[in-house]
Amino acid sequence: MARYVFITGGVVSSLGKGIAAAALGALLQARGYRVRLRKLDPYLNVDPGTMSPTQHGEVFVTDDGAETDLDLGHYERFTGRSATKTDNITTGRIYKNIIDKERRGDYLGATVQVIPHVTNEIKDFVIEGNDDYDFVICEIGGTVGDIEAMPFMEAIRQLGNDLPRGTAVYVHLTLMPYIPAAGELKTKPTQHSVKELQALGIHPDILLVRADREIPEAERRKLSLFCNVRPSAVIQALDVANIYDVPIAYHKEGLDDEVLAAFGIEPAPKPRLDPWEEVCNRIRTPEGEVTIAIVGKYTGLKDAYKSLIEALHHGGIANRVKVKLEWIESEVFEKEDPAPYLEKVHGILVPGGFGERGSEGKIHAARFARERKVPYFGICFGMQMAVIEAARNLADVSGASSTEFGPTKEPVVGLMTEWVKGNELQKRTAAGDLGGTMRLGAYKAALKKGTKISDIYGSTDISERHRHRYEVNVDYKDRLESCGLVFSGMSPDGVLPETIEYPDHPWFIGVQYHPELKSRPLDPHPLFASFIEAATEQSRLV
């Protein structure tokens, strides 16, 4: 029977509930438990697929094609368990399900209300499909007091009574700010946050308190007294140098012990944290440093590239080097020479994106990497721009462009109208909806034997996650290959190009998929490990 941990947040947003949930999941896993993590998002969008990357951050795609919150990326990276579409739900999805049921007549004429219909839908989501797990950790998005989060708070309050006694624990993450003028940490914001949570009928079992310095014992006792939790359940969550220090830091503070004690599991199995200690040791004591330029469109909000950033650091862990990132807005290269920006970097990465803005700058970056023999990694849009660059400057297709940018006589990149998913033919039109209509989720690809990318994978058959509606036009394949660009990977039916490379280049690879979504600190993705290895070699030449 599964036990449930509900994680809420207070005082301010962006405190790191997702990291806290993921770290707790990793600690319970290290003790041999089977763990599932789920995210409840209060916003009214059905999913984050159509939300601006500069507002919401990255859209994390699962194997089964769900567009989800970026916290699911943290869950996967810390636990190694692949998330599914049933691990994330939004208020928009909840209401859509309820309205569909009402239209079908499922409620038999009843007046549909927030309580019980919305809360029941949330509760059904939380408890469904958990028979194979020992612990289910549910993160509730937003902050206590947000009007959008009220139905979720009510639902998890009810679950405390619905579930068998002793199978639900509430963890509240708060902030303890330091006031320089007073020279001390303040408990009052946490007191008020807990008071508001208690007013909703939820009494936290554990307080996880963020702070930028050690919390004095007297202040912990004060929080224990005023917030009605055990002194041992006031856990300090101090700032750390990198997020992969968090599991060990929380273990030292006793978070996992306190959670297990709250469930009455004593004595608990000892955790095996050696792999995490090795990761942290590699990060703390690098044997070198490489600089990677990320030429992107959404560089104003780094969360738009969260999985990408982490995957690059995983590549650094694999090679025992520190990875320094240089962020460059691609529009800069449409007005300026890229050379001064790129001459000193050891690798260039052009990530995914949408729309014409900044595309020419990405094309210039690809050309610089090709001509100067700098390691280049093009992901999704980054692969498409590298192919357009090759078409223009190697194959003499002067008008080469993408139909995403408007009508063109040379559609080297075009809208996908048909592709195969499993045994079904998927069809799309330019006039269709934006939400949920891309080529989403895991698809297989066949790599050409003897190519660099097949050597990196150690296989010719791979499966990777996709999120795109435009694709390199296979009609240009022969023309481009005659100029030296190799289409090293295709969809199994041979219709959709998946990977490209230059055999005479130290490391120039483009992929239509998103390998960053499957990289883990304990298991770095081979492409990122190889890219950073190539950048390390380049660093010895610059």
From Swiss-Prot:
Binding site for L-glutamine: 353, 381-384, 404, 469
Binding residues annotated for ATP, in chain numbering: 14-19, 71
Keyword Metal-binding listed: yes
GO cellular component: cytosol
Catalytic activity: UTP + L-glutamine + ATP + H2O = CTP + L-glutamate + ADP + phosphate + 2 H(+); L-glutamine + H2O = L-glutamate + NH4(+); UTP + NH4(+) + ATP = CTP + ADP + phosphate + 2 H(+)
Main enzyme class: ligase
SUPFAM superfamilies per the UniProt record, alphabetical: Class I glutamine amidotransferase-like, P-loop containing nucleoside triphosphate hydrolases
Entry's EC annotation: 6.3.4.2
Domain Glutamine amidotransferase type-1: 291-541
Region: Amidoligase domain, residue numbers: 1-265
Gene Ontology MF, one: metal ion binding
Active site per the UniProt annotation: 380 (nucleophile), 514, 516
Pathway(s) per entry: Pyrimidine metabolism; CTP biosynthesis via de novo pathway; CTP from UDP: step 2/2
GO biological process: 'de novo' CTP biosynthetic process; pyrimidine nucleobase biosynthetic process
Residues engaged in binding UTP: 13, 186-191, 222
Pfam families registered for this protein in UniProt: CTP_synth_N (PF06418), GATase (PF00117)
InterPro entries assigned: Class_I_gatase-like, CTP_synthase, CTP_synthase_N, GATASE, GATase1_CTP_Synthase, P-loop_NTPase
Keywords from the named record: ATP-binding, Glutamine amidotransferase, Ligase, Magnesium, Metal-binding, Nucleotide-binding, Pyrimidine biosynthesis
Binding site for CTP: 13, 146-148, 186-191, 222
Subunit structure: Homotetramer.
Other comment: CTPSs have evolved a hybrid strategy for distinguishing between UTP and CTP. The overlapping regions of the product feedback inhibitory and substrate sites recognize a common feature in both compounds, the triphosphate moiety. To differentiate isosteric substrate and product pyrimidine rings, an additional pocket far from the expected kinase/ligase catalytic site, specifically recognizes the cytosine and ribose portions of the product inhibitor.
Family of the protein in this entry: Belongs to the CTP synthase family.
HAMAP family, per the entry: PyrG
Described purpose of this protein according to its UniProt entry: Catalyzes the ATP-dependent amination of UTP to CTP with either L-glutamine or ammonia as the source of nitrogen. Regulates intracellular CTP levels through interactions with the four ribonucleotide triphosphates.
Protein name: CTP synthase
Annotated organism of origin: Rhizobium leguminosarum bv. trifolii (strain WSM2304)
